[in-house]
Amino acid sequence: MNYTEPKVIYTCFPGGKHKVLTMSYDDGRLEDRRLVELFNRYGIRGTFNLNGGLPRPERIPESEWVELYKGHEVACHTYHHPTISRSPLDQTARQVLADRMQLEGVMGYPVRGLAYPNGSWTPEIAALLPALGIRYARVVGDTHDFAMPHDFMTWKATCHHTHNLLEDGKRFVELYKTQYLYMMYVWGHSFEFRTEEDWALMEQFCQLVGGREDTWYATNIEIVDYMADAARLQYTAAMRSPPERQWRWYETDLPHFARRTV
């Protein structure tokens, strides 16, 4: 049997893109209304981490969740926002499950993400989460790089929106090497936009990174699901090659996945 020369197969984002941008905002404060409108204007998508059990005077009422967060993701932030590293593990489980149930009852879809409240977590909590139906969890802190995470249960963002946002955004849009996958992940709280200058900074960022053909705009869970689907693909050892120097796309029946061979 004659074997073909090995071919290069890359995991790409939808449409063959090699960059993804995602946002993550906590606590469901009233300022989310303006932030969501800004994201929607520039085609940017993100995840909003809500607490089902906290008083609502300064938070988005449940009656607005479905419409406001349409096109984005709602994820857990625990029911009461405790510092869970100080809590018994069984109580942490109850905090997560109660929040999931509350959010799912309103949103009507499985809620599978978490932002650790107060940035508080332990390895034992991270190990518990998959049994509670949680597929990823965001920690606090910034990497200021664009690498894909090695562990989605301790997912650290590129930057907080007050930490070098435009500088990191400019570096992100200038990335061009398509043999790598790049992710920019911005996190924060909408109540931190206290002045018009703060809002102007975020709009400047959205103008910079929005509407770019090389970038996929995704929620947190979409990235997690996509990478999991890609990892489950099976390939034969001998790949049939296309004509020399011709690029082809092979779509599978997995959501949004494409592979490219050369």
Identify the residue ranges that each predicted region occupies.
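Active-site metal-binding loops of divalent metal-dependent hydrolases
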Residues: 25-28, 78, 190, 220
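C-terminal domain-boundary segment and adjacent tail
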Residues: 2-13, 41-43, 56, 104, ...
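A short, acidic, amphipathic alpha-helical segment used as a generic capping/interface helix at domain edges
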Residues: 166-177
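Non-membrane alpha-helical structural segments and their capping/turn regions in soluble enzymes
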Residues: 89-94, 163-166, 196-199, 203
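Metal-dependent polysaccharide deacetylase catalytic core of the NodB/CE4 family, i.e.
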Residues: 40-135, 141-159, 182-191
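Hydrophobic "anchor" residues on beta-strands that sit immediately upstream
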Residues: 22-23, 73, 215
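Short acidic, S/G/P-rich loop/turn micro-motifs used as interaction or catalytic elements
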Residues: 29, 162, 191-194
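Boundary/entry segment of secreted carbohydrate-active catalytic domains
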Residues: 1-31
